């Protein structure tokens, strides 16, 4: 069979469509509205969608301009309306089938309600969690990156604390000023998060992120010291540990600190974190987008938080917050995220298949792998804590896991024999392998190992490849490595 070559014109058209060089800027605001709607709908665990929900525009609720052939509902988006080849989320895609074009997705998009923008999403009270109503336009904020959202959340709380200090100074006769409250980093986080939080405030770094860290936090609080906030990843990167959010919430109500969750690794499809947080941050670059052609971040305010009114005013100040998500990025982020629920569910299934059928038999003494880090494998404590906040309907354990090895040579050989894309991101539609510790903490290896992040740790982010293909790739890498 002679392979058909693309013409230069076709290649140019594909690149322009794929990387957003032919977009109409006029639709950027509409794209941002849809992104916020999408986040607001899933940031609260909600079992059922309204019967009248539609993918993009709901007839009868839009003006005439919405019915014109725009980028947001043009033929380019028809690629997102395809069905799985086998009719199911967890089924495998025939990798030999000729693709229709560069924009085709084999996974159907999730329904997104397109009624009025001001309509709020709600969830009924369940298992002791308070009902929440999140307004997309008032409570969801977009950023050019996930780290920008975390930095802004931290700066917001530092500003809150500075007002407390000013009130204390103005109302006190003593000459000494009250100290700034410290920030607690709970668990071993993404490297940039650690450096940002430590660089802009005094911190307690409780890197274990388990029951021992909770006891240490409780000891600090009972000593009489007030803390500003606890930052926690759900779960942590790269050890996939999960702290006890219910206990953190109880302590926050008792001692008056705030909780900021970074749910990038778990994702809003899998984790119902907002009821236990004052602010939820996320990188939209990862699973929410998936296509690896756009960067973005989000921040969601909990309307029931003590800091909500202050945070809402803070985010309206031009000197404090500006929506810097580039217009073309917003349009492509909207397109990419239409099927993020279906992609997340598929990745959940593929990851558990890969772990159960291929990797777990090779874990243990005198075997290739020393340990697998994954929310249902890291520890019983992590599994219990994760399941307490896992979304009821679609929630799984995510597509990220880490492997450690008994032998450094085996780690290198396995990585070399793993015929996958290699890179530092996660949540992409294609599977990625990354020697996390060496690449991220090369100059701080001893510090990382102190918290269980071994230098030979290999992090895997599972994509949308079929289970059979992934299984074959990993099995071949295992077979070649054990021959050494």
Question: Across the structure, where does each feature detected by a protein language model lie?
Answer:
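PLP-dependent enzyme catalytic core of the Aspartate aminotransferase-like
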Residues: 1-78, 82-84, 91-92, 96, ...
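Conserved C-terminal alpha-helix-loop-beta "cap" of PLP-dependent enzymes
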Residues: 1, 173, 178-181, 359, ...
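Hydrophobic side chains in well-ordered alpha-helices
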Residues: 310, 410-414, 470-474
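Conserved PLP-enzyme active-site core in the AAT-like
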Residues: 59-61, 68-73, 126-368, 373, ...
């Amino acid at each position: 069979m002679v392979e058909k070559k693309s013409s230069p014109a076709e290649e140019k058209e594909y690149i322009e469509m794929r990387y957003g060089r032919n977009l109409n800027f006029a639709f950027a605001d509409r794209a941002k509205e849809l992104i916020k709607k999408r986040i607001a709908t899933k940031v609260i665990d909600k079992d059922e969608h309204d019967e009248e929900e539609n993918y993009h525009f709901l007839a009868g609720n839009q003006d005439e301009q919405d019915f014109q052939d725009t980028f947001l509902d043009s033929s380019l988006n028809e690629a997102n309306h395809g069905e799985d080849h086998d009719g199911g989320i967890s089924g495998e895609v025939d990798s030999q089938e000729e693709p229709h074009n560069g924009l085709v997705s084999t996974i159907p998009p999730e329904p997104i309600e397109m009624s009025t923008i001001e309509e709020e999403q709600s969830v009924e009270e369940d298992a002791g969690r308070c009902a929440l109503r999140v307004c997309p336009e008032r409570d969801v904020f977009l950023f050019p990156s996930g780290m920008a959202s975390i930095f802004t959340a931290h700066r917001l709380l530092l500003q809150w604390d500075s007002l407390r200090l000013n009130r204390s100074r103005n109302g006190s006769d003593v000459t000494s000023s009250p100290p700034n409250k410290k920030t607690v980093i709970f668990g071993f986080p993404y490297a940039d998060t650690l450096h940002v939080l430590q660089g802009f405030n005094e911190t307690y770094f409780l890197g274990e992120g388990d029951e021992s860290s909770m006891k240490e936090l409780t000891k600090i609080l009972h000593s009489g010291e007030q803390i500003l906030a606890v930052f926690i990843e759900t779960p942590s990167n790269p050890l996939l540990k999960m702290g006890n959010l219910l206990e953190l919430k109880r302590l926050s109500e008792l001692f008056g600190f705030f909780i900021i969750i970074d749910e990038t690794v778990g994702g809003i499809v899998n984790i119902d974190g907002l009821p236990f947080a004052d602010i939820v941050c996320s990188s939209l670059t990862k699973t929410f987008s998936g296509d690896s052609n756009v960067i973005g971040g989000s921040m969601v305010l909990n309307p029931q938080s003590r800091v909500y009114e202050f945070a809402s005013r803070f985010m309206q100040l031009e000197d404090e917050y500006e929506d810097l998500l580039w217009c073309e990025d917003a349009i492509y982020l909207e397109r990419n995220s239409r099927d993020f629920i279906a992609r997340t569910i598929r990745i959940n299934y593929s990851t558990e298949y890969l772990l159960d059928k291929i990797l777990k038999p090779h874990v243990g003494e005198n075997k290739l792998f020393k340990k697998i880090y994954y929310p249902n494998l890291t520890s019983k404590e992590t599994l219990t804590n994760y399941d307490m906040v896992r979304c009821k309907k679609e929630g799984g354990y995510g597509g990220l896991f880490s492997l450690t090895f008994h032998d450094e040579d085996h780690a290198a050989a396995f990585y070399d024999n793993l015929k996958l894309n290699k890179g530092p991101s996660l949540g992409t539609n294609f599977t990625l392998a990354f020697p996390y510790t060496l690449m991220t903490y090369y100059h701080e290896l001893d510090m990382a190992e102190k918290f269980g992040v071994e230098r030979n740790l290999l992090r895997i982010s599972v994509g949308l490849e079929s289970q059979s293909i992934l299984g074959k790739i990993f099995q071949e890498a295992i077979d070649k490595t054990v021959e050494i």
